[in-house]
Amino acid sequence: MRDLVIDNTLDSFFWAQYADLWHNSKNRSPFQAPGILQFFSQKYTNSVIAIRLLREQSTVGAVLLKKEKNIYSFLSDLKTDANFFVFRNNCSDGDIDNFFAGLLDFIKQQHSAVIFNNVASWAGYFPVFEKCAAK
């Protein structure tokens, strides 16, 4: 069973789960590393959310976003212009599709927009993202 979770409070349990995800991810971008994102999240405590996909209570995908007015952007935009989603090594295309569909539905429900600044088009998940975005 897959569940999309929106975290408004990033506590120690969240960071332990995120660190495990990042260490076991397909693309371990240093700009998505737990330490740097935790540092940034502490500077924008009321503006940061994490969107996670859970499969059997384990985090298999995540992104951290910062909200200004009605616009979400990658939290990592504070340091880099190359942005990545984080997916566990054993994440299936079905998991990734579920993650992106849930993410885009969440943005629509919030009557918000999301800015994906320089998403890594070469990343293995990108074709699934394009298909979801085209729906």
Predicted features by range, described:
Residues 1-135:
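N-acyltransferase acceptor-side catalytic subdomain
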